[in-house]
Amino acid sequence: MWADAGTAPDRSVLRADYQTAGRGRLDRRWEAPSGASLLASILFLAPPPVPTKLTQAVGRAALDAIEAVAERDLTGRLALKWPNDVLLDGRKVAGVLAQRSVRTAAVVVGLGLNVAWAPDDAASLVDD
């Protein structure tokens, strides 16, 4: 795990262009083709004792950021679904997952946002 290397500073961000072997809550598979999604991981070296608080905070920040940069009015169309989803018109548009390091106190929070592509049962910002 990235957090175990001990070389990255607190709140470092790692971004990916695509994802082929991601996993979500309950080990659900998460994939994203190249250039279709915003995929980022944020390292917290001194997180709160309950990682779900980070998950909820990052989910709320993602929702606020989507509303701020959207090219159309999404008022009332975005919602948080506990514990780790951002919904657009009731369909998942983003997921947030926190994973605690087994070697350190660090937590990595991952965010996947469907920008230009989404699985059949989800939403994306561009194609919605």
PLM region descriptions:
Residues 47-77, 88-128:
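Long, positively charged amphipathic alpha-helical accessory segments at protein N-termini or as interdomain linkers
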Residues 1-75:
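N-terminal lobe of the biotin/lipoate ligase/transferase fold
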